[in-house]
Amino acid sequence: MAILDILVYPDPRLREVAAPVAQVDDDIRRLADDMLETMYDAQGIGLAATQVGVNQRVVVMDLAEEGARQPLVLINPEILDREGAATGQEGCLSIPGFYEDVERAERIRFRALDREGRPWEQEAEGLMAVCVQHEIDHLDGKLFVDYLSELKRKRIRRKLEKLVRQGRVNVGGQTGRA
């Protein structure tokens, strides 16, 4: 397994729409394993393949309590139904150090393939619903800052660009924690 570079906003590759996975094979499973290792190393709870520069519809998540690991791999995930609305603070490994309130569906039903290529469906609410929506947004080229006002987006972009100049964050991969 390998730790991959995490792309940092405003890297244009974060805006690409990921291609569906045609076949779940050893390469896709290796990608998922590398993404999990990268996510754990960065102390995140979710990571989309587009965040590591791979244009495939693959997401990894782990919402377990600290210390316990319950990795989840979603291949070709899609949301089937949304209900309600809830606002909560979100962060992103591609926008390190920034957290903002974002409104999302309170409950969702989604489907995906597992790491063996088997289809499955699940209903989710709370943190899991937020995380699934956030990561699928990445696969569609959308970031949580897109839900913010233009003023807030510009402020975050300027601050991140300053961190890049200071060498604390490297566009194309993280070199430090913001």
UniProtKB/Swiss-Prot annotation:
GO MF, one term, reads:
metal ion binding
* Presence of the UniProt keyword Protein biosynthesis in the record: yes
Cofactor section: Fe(2+)
- Provide the cofactor note recorded for this chain's UniProt entry: Binds 1 Fe(2+) ion.
Keyword annotations = Hydrolase, Iron, Metal-binding, Protein biosynthesis
Going by the record, the broad EC class of this enzyme is hydrolase
CDD domains recorded: Pep_deformylase
Record-listed E.C. numbers: 3.5.1.88
Top-rank taxon: Bacteria
- Which residues are noted in the entry as Fe cation-binding? 92, 134, 138
Query: Which InterPro entries would you find in this protein's record?
Result: Peptide_deformylase (IPR023635), Peptide_deformylase_sf (IPR036821)
Q: Which reaction does it catalyse?
A: N-terminal N-formyl-L-methionyl-[peptide] + H2O = N-terminal L-methionyl-[peptide] + formate
Q: Which HAMAP family match?
A: Pep_deformylase
User: Function of this protein?
Assistant: Removes the formyl group from the N-terminal Met of newly synthesized proteins. Requires at least a dipeptide for an efficient rate of reaction. N-terminal L-methionine is a prerequisite for activity but the enzyme has broad specificity at other positions.
Protein name from the UniProt record:
Peptide deformylase
Q: Which organism is it from?
A: Alkalilimnicola ehrlichii (strain ATCC BAA-1101 / DSM 17681 / MLHE-1)
